[in-house]
Amino acid sequence: MADKLWRTCRLMINGLAHKVQYNQETIDSLFLPFLRRMTNLQQKKGQRFLVYLAAPPGTGKSTLALLLEKLSQMGDGIEQIQAVGLDGFHYHSDYIASHSVERDGKKIPMAMVKGCPETFDVDRLKEKLQAVKTEDVRWPVYDRRRHDVVEEVVTVRRNIILLEGNWLLLRDAGWEDIYSFADYTLFITAHAGDLKDRLIQRKIRGGMTQREAESFYERSDKLNVERVLRQSWLAQETWRLLPDGDYVLQADAPKPVQMVNRSSLWKKPDVRRSEDDIMIDRIQQQLAAYHAQGKDDYAEGYSEGMAAARRDILRNLYNSGRMSSKELLSTFELAPEDLADILMRDKA
């Protein structure tokens, strides 16, 4: 850390005071440019702009979100952002104390795994995200001193909202719709081993003993870290947390593939159609004409060619690691046996 110029900040997060350090060069070369890009994107949209900051536990996302909020208030030409958290959508402590979750066929008290996706009220989160896109709303917070949710605390009123949380990009059932509310997504990745001590120390600051903190890490935090790293949708931008607490842009991180709903696109009167789009439209018209004339051999050949191209695309997505078999099944609405046949042909 000695080779870097560190700036010390004192921030209040979820009812607890935090003294944190950030590399000045990172502030200048990563954080401020990010805020300027978000400003430009919001101005182009002309409406409220919702940014997700998703990351595993222990990566410092809550303090980072608040720092970005503070920096936006000081930066010239930067739209002020408002940082809010996902933790306010935990179920209340009395609910968690009286309910359980199922793990590997066994029921486990929610209190033992607090922080996992099952301990959040996802339906309430969806309602709030829908409302915040177009109106000012009151936002709940999680108070770590009370270990409970406090409702309707913060009024969300800025044009750029930065929402931070572990599960914002989770691909699991019940959470998949959350992704669609975001205008921009940022993910912080890290080596799971680097987060262990950070998470244990956080629990100790919250009142646990060393043994209690280590036990909670093994049964809850560790699993949550692995789940976020393995089961999150790809983000539009990825930063990496270094062992010294600094952040760097991970420029080689894979980006999400933009899927186009072509049938919906055609219905928009203001769409500028490319030459490729016009060509596809003409081919479809020609196919209809051939079919009307009884010339189905051409149509059959065309269909076979398109099917072969589709198989190649699916194999490339799978072999490159850009999409898992589960993602291919859900995205392209394939039957498991059809996907298996496509992938087996690649090995043949």
Predicted regions: what they are:
Residues 82, 91-143:
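Conserved nucleotide-sensing/catalytic segment adjacent to the nucleotide-binding pocket
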Residues 259-348:
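Intrinsic-disorder/low-complexity detector
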